[in-house]
Amino acid sequence: MIKVLIIVFVLLSLFAGGDRTAKSLMTTAINVTIFAVLIELIYLGFNIVFTTAVAAILITAATIFYQNENNIKTVSAFISVVIVLVLSSFFIAFIITHAHLQGFGIVGDVKIQPSNGYEEDIGINMRLVQVAVFIVILIGGLIDTAVAICSGTYEIIRHNPNANRSEIIESGMNIGCKILSSNVNTLFFIFAGEFMIMCISFLKFYSWSTLINSKDFTQELIAIMISAIGTVVIIPISSYVASRFMCHGNVAD
């Protein structure tokens, strides 16, 4: 069934978008490959922080440059995403450490423990793995927002070349605010759809407080919240970076 869905998706995408969609599909394939290599390297014992940083940069570069080509818009978006990823890494590590989000939760109805045939200690720093997970979750929203702001700012400057830097930043902020609600709603409904069945099954036997304090629920909720925060933070950063790159006659007519 999965193969059928993949084939249907690819055929419909190519029919709807042609060559442009083909590049998007190729970008997705590249990103899946990078993610698979990241998992394998972590499993083999490579430094989690370094491999995740390299993978995040490669995924960002593939998505922005391969799909949208190399120009002043994509360079601005790439730099903005990298800045937010660096800042977010420290914030994510702080949250995971103090919320004790690392480690296994419950897989189905089975808790990860030796009595169930599972090994709790797999020889990997689970705190760093959780940081890597949150960073990977964060990347998509950052890229979409940064590309939208930098592309919009580019068009504004192209049609109004006399705009000063403060006006350009304000325009970028306005663009970001317009797409913010859509991005946050998308993140929320991803979370709501994924955990609807779990919430129903939990509430059948446990209270709301037990549900909210469960590790599985908390991990996913905080991941979505961090993604939403990152989407907000990148708005002023993208606006500023775009203004720095595009303000002094760097935009072609």
What is each of the regions a protein language model found here?
Residues 42, 99-124, 200-221:
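Membrane-interfacial helix-loop-helix connectors in multipass membrane proteins
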Residues 142-156:
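Short helical (or helix-break) motifs at transmembrane helix termini and adjacent helical loops
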Residues 1-107:
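N-terminal transmembrane hairpin
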Residues 80, 124, 132, 136, ...:
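Pore-lining and gate-forming transmembrane alpha-helices of multi-pass membrane transport proteins
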Residues 86, 141-145, 179-184, 220-236:
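Hydrophobic transmembrane alpha-helical segments of multi-pass transport and channel proteins
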Residues 165-177:
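Helix-loop junctions and hydrophobic alpha-helical segments within the transmembrane domains
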Residues 89, 93, 178-195:
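Hydrophobic alpha-helical transmembrane segments in multi-pass membrane proteins
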Residues 157-166:
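Juxtamembrane helix-boundary/capping and inter-helix hinge elements in multi-pass membrane proteins
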